[in-house]
From Swiss-Prot:
GO terms for cellular component: chloroplast; ribonucleoprotein complex; ribosome
Family: Belongs to the universal ribosomal protein uS8 family.
Name the UniProt record assigns to this protein: Small ribosomal subunit protein uS8c
Molecular function via GO: rRNA binding; structural constituent of ribosome
Entry keyword RNA-binding: yes
Length: 134
């Protein structure tokens, strides 16, 4: 675990998806809970439950996989960390990038909490671009 909890979440999910693991365990923080809610709402993960072990809270995520055995396995999730502790990236609502022409999701940290690019455009607020998911 590093000091960048968002990068830890993204790396854990990406590694589990790459090795076809169906369950991922990530540390439970306010930021991770907000990001996981967005992933669940957008359909990138199937299920979330809270788990407590040795006085530490964890989120147990069930990933969504393609179940086609005829073709080679391809990753379903593509996640990329954008703003990081060494280089923060901010955007106003007009310049929030569209991922795959609107098919992907941009997660932003705004003054009203963590939200997707669509929600930020509707509320006309910008913020720090945390990550891309497609």
């Amino acid at each position: 675990m590093s000091s960048d909890t968002i990068a830890d979440i993204i790396t854990s999910i990406r590694n589990a998806d790459m090795y076809r693991k169906s369950v991922v365990r990530v540390a439970s923080t306010n930021i991770s809970q907000s990001i996981v809610k967005i992933l669940l709402r957008e359909g990138f993960i199937e299920n979330v439950r809270k788990h407590r072990e040795n006085n530490k809270d964890f989120l147990v995520l069930t990933l969504r996989h393609r179940r086609n055995r005829k073709r080679p396995y391809r990753n379903l999730l593509n996640l990329k960390r954008i703003s990081r502790p060494g280089l923060r990236i901010y955007s106003n609502y007009q310049r929030i990038p569209r991922i795959l022409g609107g098919m992907g999701v941009v997660i932003l940290s705004t003054s009203r909490g963590i939200m997707t690019d669509r929600e930020a455009r509707l509320e006309r607020i910008g913020g720090e671009i945390l990550c891309y998911i497609w």
